[in-house]
Amino acid sequence: MGRLTTHVLDTAAGTPGKDLAITLFKIVNNLRQPIKTVRTNHDGRCEAPLLEGEALQAGIYELDFAVGDYYRAAGVSLPDPAFLDVVTLRFGVADAGAHYHVPLLVSPWSYSTYRGS
């Protein structure tokens, strides 16, 4: 059964990115269709897969990570506008039966991702 998961690591603080808002979109005809918004838990993870089973279909998706709000809530001084406010990751799902883990490693000045397991 396929599933889509994520987690957030705050590389500036060396801690999980807890209570960070994430919005999932599916891209259909070049338009973003919102699917759900969740918040990470104390471990920087979502309580459940973002999508699983029949809900995960082949196609293009985006995850919006509200990193500016996360850092402001943590008391980090950011410029106005913030260098990174919303980090958007666009990725493709070719095999809807596979596990797609799309983590975000982030600081106020940089981010990276990879396809995890």
Curated annotation (Swiss-Prot):
Q: Which reaction does it catalyse?
A: 5-hydroxyisourate + H2O = 5-hydroxy-2-oxo-4-ureido-2,5-dihydro-1H-imidazole-5-carboxylate + H(+)
Question: Protein biosynthesis among the record's keywords?
Answer: no
Q: Where does substrate bind?
A: 7, 45, 114
Spans traversing the lipid bilayer: none
Pfam families associated with the record = Transthyretin (PF00576)
EC assignment: the record states 3.5.2.17
Q: Which domain of life is it from?
A: Bacteria
Q: Which Gene3D superfamilies match?
A: Transthyretin/hydroxyisourate hydrolase domain (2.60.40.180)
Q: Which GO terms describe its molecular function?
A: hydroxyisourate hydrolase activity
BP GO annotations: purine nucleobase metabolic process
Swiss-Prot/TrEMBL keywords? Hydrolase, Purine metabolism
Among its keywords, does the record have Transcription?
Answer: no
Subunit info? Answer: Homotetramer.
Summarize the protein's role.
Catalyzes the hydrolysis of 5-hydroxyisourate (HIU) to 2-oxo-4-hydroxy-4-carboxy-5-ureidoimidazoline (OHCU).
Further information in the entry reads:
HIU hydrolysis also occurs spontaneously, but more slowly.
Tell me which PANTHER family the record gives. 5-HYDROXYISOURATE HYDROLASE, URICASE AND TRANSTHYRETIN-RELATED
Task: Report the sequence similarity comment from the record.
Answer: Belongs to the transthyretin family. 5-hydroxyisourate hydrolase subfamily.
Listed name of the protein: 5-hydroxyisourate hydrolase
Q: Which organism is it from?
A: Ralstonia nicotianae (strain ATCC BAA-1114 / GMI1000)
